[in-house]
Amino acid sequence: MAEEIDDNEFYRENFSADSDWEVFNAQLGEILQKWDVSSDSETRNLKSEEIFSCNWKVEREKLDMLRNGIEVEYHQAILEDEELVRAEAKEITCLQRTSCHHDLMSTGNSFGPPIRSSQELHILARIYGLRRFIVLHPVNPTLNYMRSTSEFNFFLSAVAVVSAEVQSLVPIFVQIYDPKWNYYTGVALAPALRTNFRLIGLEKAPPECRFLMGLLTLFREKVPTSYTQAAMISVCTTYALDTMRIRMPMYVPFDHGLSSEDIVVDGEVSHLEVQQFCALPHGYKPESRTEIYLVYTWPELSEHVAFDSEQRSDFVPAKAPLGKIYLSVEASSYLSCCLRDYQSVAEVTRSLESFVGRNFSGTSSGAEAASNPLDRITEHKLTKRRERSFELPSQAGLTKRLPGPMTESELSELLAYLFPDMHPEMALFPYAKKNFTDKFDPMRIKSAVPDSLVCRLSCLLATCHAHLGSVEGMAQVWAAFTRQLRLLWDNSLMVPGISAGFPDTRTCLLHQKLQMLNVCVERRVQREANSKRKSEGMVGKASSEEEEDEDDDEGEFFDCDDLTAGAGSPTKAVLSLKPEGRLRRLNNERLLEEPDEYLYIPDTQEPVPKTEDQLQDDAEVMLKLGPGSGLTTQMMCTSLLSDMEAFKAANPRGIMEDFIRWYSPKDWEEVTDELGQVKHQLSIRMTTEGNTWQKVWEQAQAVPVSRQKRLFDDTNEALKVLHYLETRKMHEIYNLTVIPLLHSAILKLADILSNAELEDLFSSQIEKLLSDLCRLSRSHSDELPSIKPLLDDLAELERRFYQFKCFERLSGYPKRSSLQQVKLQFEEILRNDNCCTIVNRRLTAAGDGTLYDILIPKLEEDMADRLISKDYIIRLDGDTKTTEKGLYLGPQFMRAIVTGEKLRLCGAFTESTAFV
């Protein structure tokens, strides 16, 4: 039986098992050592209000304790790197003073703004002014918070023991009770000193504890050691003025009964004015408001100087040395809401046909013809069929109502805004006659010219999505837009509101597509004009039908296939030495092998325009084919082959060197031989074996431009553009229009600020928005980056504008103050986090035309009813000079926040741990 016993499975009792408390201590100790809490390098004094303006770094670790675990957070202020001032360095002579002691005694960080502008600032930093501290709390504090005294003692004792073991100089707090109460208990250790932190709250405090006299008595009772010097006090009182509302009613372009006037809200009505019409809404929601607080501060007083009790108080606004006004704005703009709503379209993957049905363009020669390239081979006399379809399209198809929430009259009004020339009876906003490039820098934002067709369309789509039918209304407008484009093409009319010239790849893709459509219309009109001009000059005896066919051959390019494009017919072969297609002579240059003949510049085909996506597709194809592929050479040299064939037709006796002299003069180099004679020869890249130029020259035959195959088929390219626009899905339409939309929104806001004469006040914010949009528009990623940060900045600027209008009214403009005075003080609000100084007796006396003079009538009234809180801080610091034994007694700190009958006490009392 004994032989069957396995020693490995034999049970052994572990007598060294640790308790939960010891395990927790070990885990917490490892975390504190990793954070290096025993060092105290940052011992310089804090600047005034530095705690409230600096950035914070928060590190988190999780421990498996108390059901769902305990989270340990290390909060640390990121201070500017500055060397200690000499006078300050001399002051720091006691090794027992830590940064925690300095922070508790710092009067410059006693009171922060009454409005929490940043959620990152922890309440312990606001109450005690600490630059770094550690907090322990349950992982889900709202569900599993600490309730019992045993839990408090468990963690607080662990914190005290671990702090002593690792020699931590950072205060450590434990959050207790419900998190919304903000109750903490904590401890901070220093050599021979221990500071105990306690936070409590009373719903109804004793009357004597709501004033300074009673609080001083309570403070003296809590101080563990007797101090000979007087305590220093800091006091802050906060008053709330009436909430200010300014109604800026909603304005929606092409408003059909939309208005916010049915919501009755008290407040002054102020309509926003703009110089340039933009199809985007503006105004602010009725619930927008600005809350105004007056904060008076007594930064540092001796306890024997001031008196404060139920009977009499010295802490009244008229006696305050420092007074500030804070403006808390909650404003929501219809413009920002419209842009945020438009973001949702990025997630809509439905096709346009699912909203408006198939064949919404109203003609059968649309997307279907372009989408089936086999028709070009199987159909006979395709060119003539196209010519017949280019005449007036079917009016029944074009006037067919598009499905959607808008009526025909409403849709016609929107189309009149986009195409004013096509609806002269309804056009209210014609396009500017001056050059579109005057107001737009394409090197910056990859958008379109302001108030161009692209910008108007983008704004209309966003407005329709927000106010005129959601996604269905947006799809209806886009379908009507593409149908109008097809109507313009079928009638050989230029698209209005688009920059002239080839597709500019510095602009957005939608603008490039419309530029391409205009180029196609221009080429088509030019080609048809040339054909008509030649047909009128023809004299012959052939029948009318034969004359028409012959005119087509002379006036238009042949749609021949690639194999026979260069050769032509036998009667037009390169063997003929009759020059054709000459444009003009190249100065007095002569052919190298025929000095008696001049060198002529041939009539060549115009360059082939391409949009950005086409260039990208070509690059991808050539990358896949590789550099050695013949197709790659053919793609790159199509235009070169056409020019060489035209040159040979114009100069039958010319050689490649003659062509290079005209086409690429830099490759015709001047050299000096051994005898000192100057000669010319081709460059090295032209004479390299297997040179592409030589191959193409050998392949090229003498074919004038009139008989060459067209490099650019304007008909096919126009149908491609129309097909592209008609087959976009909703999220693709969003990607095409979001950058011009944001660009127009920023310019609209700049226009509003300019009309209010505030462009100088907010110029830096506008410039930042444009710079951010520039980076966003030129992102190289396949997916558009998130526009949320830009929308947040835009909404913040709109809130600032609403805040200024309220501050302008508060300042008594225009009767009691000038606009320049209001702007000067509002600049301080922008710099100081919604705060403006109205009283500063340290620097100047009150008055002198400041906001204080305007608020005097309000201050002379009884302000007691407007008092919302009183904040008292009592400090007592014992240095080595105040005790007989030369011991540092440490800081004593108590803060009392009185709000009506409620009282919150926050104490930090230091005791000695040395045995004397």
UniProtKB/Swiss-Prot annotation:
GO CC terms, sorted: cytoplasm; endoplasmic reticulum tubular network; postsynapse; protein-containing complex
GO MF assignments: GTPase activator activity; small GTPase binding
Main location: cytoplasm
InterPro entries on file: Rab3GAP1 (IPR045700), Rab3GAP1_conserved (IPR026147)
Quaternary organization: The Rab3 GTPase-activating complex is a heterodimer composed of Rab3GAP1 and Rab3-GAP.
Family, per entry: Belongs to the Rab3-GAP catalytic subunit family.
The protein, known as: Rab3 GTPase-activating protein catalytic subunit
Organism encoding this protein: Drosophila melanogaster (Fruit fly)
Taxonomic lineage: Eukaryota, Metazoa, Ecdysozoa, Arthropoda, Hexapoda
The gene coding this protein: Rab3GAP1
